[in-house]
Curated annotation (Swiss-Prot):
It comes from Mus musculus (Mouse). Residues 710-729 are annotated as: Disordered. It comes from the Eukaryota. Keywords: Bait region, Disulfide bond, Glycoprotein, Protease inhibitor, Secreted, Serine protease inhibitor, Signal, Thioester bond. GO terms for cellular component: extracellular space. Pfam families: A2M, A2M_BRD, A2M_recep, MG2, MG3, MG4, TED_complement. A proteinase activates the inhibitor by specific proteolysis in the bait region, which, by an unknown mechanism leads to reaction at the cysteinyl-glutamyl internal thiol ester site and to a conformational change, whereby the proteinase is trapped and/or covalently bound to the inhibitor. There is a cross-link at C974-Q977 (Isoglutamyl cysteine thioester (Cys-Gln)). This is Murinoglobulin-1.
Length: 1476
């Protein structure tokens, strides 16, 4: 009973469907309204109305309903019976970036009413933003130059305000930030300087748009040496399983296009299994080598593979230098030796319309195979056919689809009718096959339309494309006289073209068949992809449709041409770069050394790259569940219905008109039949799918191949979210070698032309130039990459060591390379100089014959005579000669007949460098004040090494201001030392700003140093927000409490000047807070750098005072809970100190006094200062404090040594405590501070710093605050005179206009006595620096050093050019252990360290860091005790040097710099006269 009832309901539903058709056939009005499913604000959008068989006037209304209300889009009165019209409307900008709304379409007449709603996505019109950098890879310390480009989707420039941009390092630290960036005509050019030691790896430039979306661009920071040449590797893409030999061609070419002399090593390895073949060969005259590598033994013996992959690597080694460069490639060994590629095969078929198939047969190299049989089989039809490929390897088939009963069509195409190697374990070649599946298009009446186009072709812009439309119409067409086909073209989500075609129907024609052509203009607005929909409405209301996608050429309307005035230029010559673009275009130019792109290839800025940007993509809109569409009627499923009315039961793979419309990105409002009948079950609507037909197992295994063209093997990054002189040059002196040559913005004139005159850099290379132009009329334009070869017909290269010691001799070599096809008579000259003697080696120095494409090396044995920097100028000149050059006549090039290279050599005195600085602050009123000074030298001084100069400056910070990045004569390799490069810039900026002396030049320089220091300090940050000496990359398990507090206060103070990511400050503060105990004191984490901070004082007390001070200097109020508890800790600690009156707590008391002063607790500050006064040392008009115990001095001093780091630091804290008095320091505070300042200035070194890092930072803070409080602009001049007991005398005038100027004079008498006199009004800072070298002598020192070379003697032939240096170090001073220690190993002249062996030392437990500078190896040791530490590394000869002098090893305590020791080592062959 229930089943019978169910069947009746189903039949009733079917009848309803037929009644609906009948009603439409009887003349009811038909409506079809099409609108894009995604609508954009502030831009014209179209909605297309198709109203058919109207019998009355109607009004069409469209409105958009959102949570904010209803927006009426248009009201259109329709008077015509039939209407096909598109109406434009504009949606105002949304407050959010997008929202899902309902679009309502209402059609109302006197007797008719149609109303429907559909969900649409409304989006604000978005900009397209991308970033271009001047190059893809940077060295530490270089400037990152980049452009932000902003356009609309039509690629027109936008003047856009971008709220935020920043640079992110590999650790996700935000190291630089900009806000509110305004692009002008679509462009904004910016730059950022990297720190000298940044984190290396991938960096990101991130740009935020107003919508909140962000665009990213990546670049890499790494240490590198630019490759001088490139390696081109050619291997076949694929080979047959029967091939025994792999042909490999490797070529080495210099960046200026000439072949590389040398040899090549080729390695061929299988991917999945072990086994390689290596072949070595010499490069030929073209720089190439082709090798046939036998691979039979490498091929896999397994039988179950389809493809084997072989990796090929070619390493070219340059002759003479040993420089290497590699290139890799892959080749596939395949069992299928030819391929069939589908060029045409639609995804769907239509019953009754032929299904067209076009394939191409290609061989394993991708070349077409003509005159070969190709077989096709269609499983559903039991259809087979064969044809022969034409000359292009093409084969075409047409399959009659009339008799297909199912919903799918499975096709297989074979090269051979039967494959003799179809079983699994076959090792023979297999023949090509390809498969394709097409599914049916749904039509109730079996009527269809089909658009025929070559989908594989790319349509060129600004042309007409013809589309053939085929149709077949069945069913009851009545007395239909004509049929109108309507079409729409969409691109970028909008309707851009519409049209129609009318077909006249012949009386009695059944079925109606035909075809017609549509001509579609290919417009720029269609790039890169357009979709076309065609449909017609049959008399019964059924709609039939088809669609096709067009891939459009990625063209740009702004045609940009870039060219150099010549394709090849001499280095240092003038050239012109000419840009042609749309008038008034703004163009960004770039030219980069090709070597940079060899090192790290990048995606070329091209139209394809632009159209792949995220902002250019069109995503499909799927409504959310809350905006689901109105429920559709459905037919209740029954087996009876399925059996009796199969034409009414669709399969899930069939495609209806609704899907065609949806795939176009359209939404349809209609009362027509465009959708498959939905089968509904008792539990709801479910579309039914027919069982999928599985392909015959005989078709497997197979590989499907798609049409593709490989343009280059070079790896690319994925798309990103990234006037010339007419006079020939006769001589060039080359010294300018940039990596980026051109990075500029120019505007083309009204005729569309711009010319830039520029000088070609000195690098002999190929420059790659490109232009990006933006026009308000034509939008974006890109030039192709334009090369300029900077090349000389011949040039000279000079090699010499970085430095030598006086008395040593070395071989200076000059190699001349001739790349002309003719020979030249050459003359090579080393310019004479009184600074050295040079003896030619060989008898061809004056003149020799240099053959075509040849090279020749001339040598001189050079012995320097002067100390310091010595210039060597080598010139190579082609000369006129009547004598034949070999069998040829010698030629002289028209341009560039002379090449000159100037190089500098540092000549150092032998022995150990010593420096003494005598600094004084003179404050004169009216009476003249004077001071005597004696310069004396030790008996072991090295002859002629002494030099001295006297400096006068008008400001207390002048020296430090000039040397903010060189305050110490020490390395800066750890997190604490780096802060001396950072913090002093804050004090300098504050001081100069308060005293109104800040110039733009000083400000720019200081801000640059702050940004670099900020970047570098992030290297030492731990994941928990703390900081340590060497960061967490060296395995340090915990951060350092003291350093974290130091970084916290410095970052907080720097916020006033540069961008500091607030998260770094917050994380550091949180970590410190977690270290606070219940009593308010702080637990120590990590070791103290300077154990003088202990000095009999409770570590926790001193550390807590320092952290409290740092928190207060970070602008935290004294009432903050953490600070308040910390101050309670200090008050308790002060009580303990008062009770222990016999102990000395000078360092801790100085810190506490400053902390209480910062907190505003004047009483406690005064108490502590009074206690300190009792321990003060008052002498020579100065007041200072000393430590109770001092470390043992390492030698007898000629001069009173500088105070230790801790003593400078605690005296500076006393000054800061006095100057921080509230509301202002009293006259007594200023007077007492002045007395301590006098003592502090005498401790300064020649660069304005002090003994070490922390004392330099604190003392400069004190000096800057004192200078600001006491600053005055005197109208009078201060006169400074220095005179010797002999005839020397020099006067200096200091006034407001030259306060910051360094005035200096060399002192002639060493040894000698001098008098310094100061008269006038005001304070001046005077400094004398004495430097000399002294011979190493045995002395009592705080360290024991033992140095030895391995081998010890020259008996081992390796001792000539490479040997090991072994060191043993122990501490012999008065303390249990040293502070951090630096072992500074100077290189022998002409030798360089083998970097991997130095880096390997960092694996040792006691080595924290190593550095390799120009001429030194620095080894950082955590601390040294009486236990001997041993380590070794290897050095190798770079340039031969004769009469090698010993090199010095210096070991010293970083914070107690008078604790040091020296040793020396010699080459095992130092006395070997054949060392050169």
């Amino acid at each position: 009973m229930w089943k019978s009832r169910r069947a009746q309901l189903c039949l009733f539903s079917v009848l309803l469907a037929f009644l609906h058709s009948a009603s439409l056939l009887n003349g009811d009005s038909k409506y079809m309204v099409l609108v894009p499913s995604q609508l954009y604000t502030e831009t014209p959008e179209k909605i297309c109305l198709h109203l058919y068989q109207l019998n009355e006037t109607v009004t069409v209304t469209a409105s958009l309903v959102s949570q904010s209300g209803r927006k009426n889009l248009f009201d259109e009165l329709v008077l015509d019976k039939d209407l096909f019209q598109c109406v434009s409307f504009i949606i105002p900008r949304l407050s959010s970036s997008d929202e899902e709304d309902f679009l309502y379409v209402d059609i109302k007449g006197p007797t008719h009413e149609f109303s429907k709603r559909k969900a649409v996505l409304v989006k604000n019109k978005e900009s397209v933003v991308f970033v271009q950098t001047d190059k893809p890879v940077y060295k530490p310390g270089q400037s990152v130059k980049f452009r932000v480009v902003s356009m609309d989707k039509m690629l027109r420039p936008l003047n856009e305000l971008l709220p935020l941009a920043y640079i992110e390092d590999p650790k996700k630290n935000r190291i630089m930030q900009w806000r509110d960036i305004k692009t002008e005509n679509g462009l904004k050019q910016m730059s950022f300087s990297l720190a000298a030691e940044p984190i290396q790896g991938p960096y990101k430039i991130v740009v935020h748009k107003e919508s909140g979306e962000k665009e990213e661009h990546s670049f890499t920071v790494m240490e590198f040496v630019l490759p001088r040449f490139n390696v081109d590797l050619k291997v076949p893409n694929a080979m047959s399983v029967n091939d025994e030999v792999l042909s490999v061609t490797a070529c080495g070419k210099y960046t200026y296009g000439k072949p590389v002399p040398g040899h090549v090593k080729i390695n061929v390895c299988r991917e999945t299994e072990t086994g390689c073949r290596e072949v070595n060969s010499q490069l030929d005259n073209n720089g190439c080598s082709t090798q046939e590598v036998n691979i039979t033994e490498l091929q896999s013996k397994k039988r179950n593979y389809e493809v084997q992959l072989f990796h090929v690597n070619a390493t070219v080694t340059e002759e003479g230098t040993g420089l290497e460069f590699s290139r890799s490639g892959t080749t596939k060994i395949e069992r299928i030796t030819n391929k069939l590629i589908f060029l045409k095969a639609d995804s769907h078929f239509r019953h009754g319309i032929p299904f067209f198939v076009k394939v191409r047969l290609v061989d394993i190299k991708g070349d077409p195979i003509p005159n070969e049989k190709v077989f096709i089989k269609a499983q559903e039809l039991s259809y087979t056919s064969a044809t022969t490929t034409d000359q292009h390897g093409l084969a075409e088939f047409s399959i009659d689809t009339t008799c297909i009963s199912g919903s799918s069509l499975h096709i297989k195409v074979n090269h051979k009718e039967e494959d003799s190697c179809s079983y699994f374990y076959c090792m023979e070649e297999r023949h090509a096959s390809a498969k394709h599946v097409a599914y049916a298009v749904y039509s109730l009446s079996k009527s269809y339309i089909y658009l025929d186009t070559e989908t594989s072709s790319i349509l060129p812009c600004n042309q007409i494309h013809t589309v053939q439309a085929h149709f077949i119409l069945k069913g009851d067409l009545g007395v239909l006289k004509e049929l109108i086909f309507y079409y729409l073209v969409m691109a970028q989500g909008s309707i851009i073209q519409t049209g129609n075609h009318t077909h006249q129907v012949e009386p009695g024609e059944a079925p109606v068949k035909g075809k017609f052509a549509l001509e579609i203009p290919v417009e720029f607005s269609m790039v890169p992809m357009a979709k076309m929909l065609i449909y017609t409405i049959l008399p019964d209301g059924e709609v039939i449709a088809d669609s096709v996608n067009f891939e459009i050429e990625k063209c740009l309307r702004n045609k940009v041409d870039l060219r150099f005035s010549t394709s090849q230029s001499l280095p240092a010559s003038q050239t012109r770069l000419q840009v042609t673009a749309s008038p008034q275009s703004l163009c960004g130019l770039r030219a980069v050394d090709q070597s940079v792109l060899l090192l790290k290839p990048e995606s070329e800025l091209s139209p394809s790259w632009i159209y792949n940007l995220p902002g250019m993509q069109q995503n499909k809109f799927v409504p959310s569940s809350r905006l689901s569409e109105d429920q559709e009627d459905c037919i209740l499923y029954s087996s009876w219905l399925a059996e009796k009315h199969t034409n009414l039961v669709p399969h899930g793979t069939e495609k209806d008109v609704y899907r065609y419309v949806e795939d176009m990105g359209l939404t349809a409002f209609t009362n027509l039949m465009i959708k498959l009948p939905i089968i509904c079950f008792d539990y709801g609507m479910v579309p039914i799918s027919a069982p999928r037909v599985e392909f015959d197992l005989a078709f497997t295994p197979e590989i499907s191949w798609s049409l593709r063209t490989t343009l280059s093997k070079r790896p690319e990054e994925p798309p990103r979210k990234d006037p010339s002189s007419n006079d020939p040059l006769t001589e060039t002196i080359r010294k300018y070698f940039p990596e980026t040559w051109v990075w500029d913005i120019v505007t083309v004139n009204s005729t569309g032309l711009a010319e830039v005159e520029m000088t070609v850099p000195d690098t002999i290379t190929e420059w790659k130039a490109g232009a990006l132009c933006l026009s308000n009329d034509t939008g974006l334009g890109l030039s192709s990459v334009v090369p300029l070869q900077a090349f000389k017909p011949f040039f000279v290269e000079v090699s010499l060591p970085y430095s030598v010691v006086r008395g040593e001799a070395f071989m200076l070599k000059a190699t001349v390379m001739n790349y002309l096809p003719t020979s030249m008579q050459m003359s090579v000259q080393l310019e004479a100089s009184p600074d050295f003697t040079a003896v030619p080696v060989g008898d061809d120095q004056d003149s020799y014959c240099l053959s075509a494409n040849g090279r020749h090396t001339s040598s001189w044995l050079v012995t320097p005579k002067s100390l310091g920097n010595v210039n060597f100028s080598v010139s190579a000149e082609a000369q006129q000669s009547s004598e034949p050059c070999g069998s040829e006549v010698a030629t002289v090039p028209e341009t560039g007949r002379k090449d000159t290279v100037v190089k500098v050599l540092i000549v150092e005195p032998e022995g150990i460098k010593q420096e003494h600085t005598f600094s004084s602050l003179f404050c004169a009123s009216d009476a003249e004040i004077s001071e005597k000074m004696s310069l004396v030298l030790p008996p072991t001084v090295v002859k002629d090494s002494a030099r001295a100069h006297f400096s006068v400056m008008g400001d207390i910070l002048s020296s430090a201001i000039r040397n903010t990045q060189n305050l110490l004569h020490m390395p800066y390799g750890c997190g604490e030392q780096n802060m001396v490069l950072f913090a002093p810039n804050i004090y300098v900026l504050k001081y100069l700003n308060e005293t109104q002396q800040l110039t733009q030049k000083i400000k720019t320089k200081a801000l640059g140093f702050l940004r670099a220091g900020y970047q570098r300090e992030l290297n030492y940050k731990h994941k928990d927000g703390s900081y340590s000496a060497f960061g967490d990359q060296n395995g340090e398990r915990e951060g350092n409490t003291w350093l974290t507090a130091f970084v916290l206060k410095s970052f907080a103070q720097a916020r006033a000047f540069i961008f500091i990511d607030e998260s770094h400050i917050t994380h550091a503060f949180t970590w410190l807070s977690q270290k606070q105990k219940d009593n308010g004191c702080f637990r120590s984490s990590g070791s103290l750098f300077n154990n003088a901070m202990k000095g009999g004082v409770d570590d926790e007390m001193t550390l807590s005072a320092y952290i409290t001070m740092a928190l207060l200097e970070s602008s935290l109020p004294a009432t903050h809970p953490v600070v308040s508890k910390a101050l309670s800790c200090l008050e308790s600690s002060w009580k303990t100190i008062e009770q222990e009156r016999n102990a000395s707590f000078v360092y801790t008391k100085a810190l506490m006094a400053y902390a209480f002063a910062l907190a505003g607790n004047q009483n406690k500050r005064d108490e502590i200062l009074k206690s300190l006064d009792e321990e003060a040392i008052k002498e020579n008009n100065s007041i200072h404090w000393k430590r109770p115990q001092k470390s043992r001095k390492s030698e007898h001093h000629l001069y009173k040594p500088q105070a230790s780091s801790a003593e400078v630091e605690m005296n500076a804290y006393v000054v800061l405590a006095r100057l921080t008095a509230q509301p202002a320091p009293s006259p007594e505070d200023l007077t007492l501070s002045m007395s301590t300042i006098m003592w502090l200035t005498k401790q300064q070194n020649s660069n304005g710093g002090f003994s070490s890092t922390q004392d330099t930072v604190v003392a400069l803070d004190a000096l800057s605050k004192y200078g600001a409080v006491t600053f005055s602009r005197s109208q009078k001049t201060t006169l400074v005179t220095i005179q010797s007991t002999g005839s020397f005398s020099q006067k200096f005038q200091v006034e407001n206009s030259n306060r910051l100027l360094l005035q200096q004079v060399a002192l002639p008498d060493i040894p000698g006595d001098y008098t310094i006199s100061v008269s006038g009004e005001g304070c001046v800072y005077a400094q004398t620096m004495l430097r000399y070298n002294m011979h190493l002598e045995k002395q009592l020192s705080a360290f024991a050093i033992w140095v030895q070379t391995v081998p010890l003697t020259c008996n081992n032939p390796k001792g000539h050019n490479s040997f090991q240096i072994s060191l043993e170090i122990s501490y012999t001073g008065s303390r249990p252990a040293s502070n951090m220690v630096i072992a500074d190993v100077k290189m022998l002249s002409g030798f360089i360290p083998l970097k991997p062996t130095v880096k390997k030392l960092e694996r040792l437990e006691h080595v924290s860091r190593t550095e390799v500078s120009n001429n030194n190896v620095l080894i950082y040791l955590d601390q040294v005790t009486n236990q001997t530490l041993a380590f070794s590394f290897i050095i190798q000869q770079d340039i031969p040097v004769r009469n090698l002098q010993p090199a010095i090893v210096k070991v010293y305590d970083y914070y107690e710099t008078d604790e040091m020791a020296f040793a020396e080592y010699s080459s095992p062959c130092s006395t070997d006269k054949q060392n050169v």
